[in-house]
Amino acid sequence: MYYFTSDVHLGAGDETFSRRTEQRFVKWLDKVAEDADAIFLVGDIFDFWFEYGRVIPKGFVRVLGKLAELTDRGVKIYFFIGNHDMWCRDYLEKECGVKTFFKPQHMTLAGKEVFIAHGDNMNVGNQPMLRLMNTCFRSRILRKLFSWCVHPDLALKFGQWWSGKSRKSHLKDHITPSSLEFLIDYARDYKRHNTTTDYVVFGHMHYPYDHAEEHLRVLFLSNWDAEVKYAAMDRDGRISLKTF
């Protein structure tokens, strides 16, 4: 089995809410690890993550420990950066054994061709300010300057404030199926250029949705604020959204 989830946003909310989310996520990891060929964490697992050369954010020890435990047991875990945890470096890979991807990936799973991406920074060609902001945030030079010039405490306070603003823009009450159309269009265009693609999996929108059309499925994963919808794909290549 292959499992996909996203937008856990560990660290969001007050301490009680954050701890409860972390505990639920650990239970989910334990559950799916029982028969997982691989687990895909499709971005924004952390509400904010900025990794210095020798410093990582305080907290998340249950999740970090669980990731290390599972990979030590041989479970394959793949981590895709999202717009909230794009400033990862090599900590998760070196310390937790989690393969980290900084770009979308096209993979063959159970005989199916699957394109996996968080979903941010896509179809933004007509949004110059968003394109510029994404370029700045992903700049290695600016990231290095930030780590040299800004104390970790200040960096995390700023990051948590910024992440809170960004997360509120994707409140589920504000999202409808029509809000997903720009990513569905992206998936269609990707399919035109990569004709063997069977499935496209996105996070980011905090709205679970299974869009099917001829020769293409596009699945959107939920966030973890309430009922969780994750994707599961069996060894015959059948994929669907499940509830946790």
Give each language-model segment a name.
Residues 1-3, 107-115, 213-218:
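Beta-strand-turn-beta hairpins that frame and shape the catalytic cleft
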Residues 2-4, 39-41, 115, 201:
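Residue-level marker for buried hydrophobic side chains located in beta-strands
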Residues 5, 10-109:
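Core catalytic region of metal-dependent phosphoesterases/phosphodiesterases
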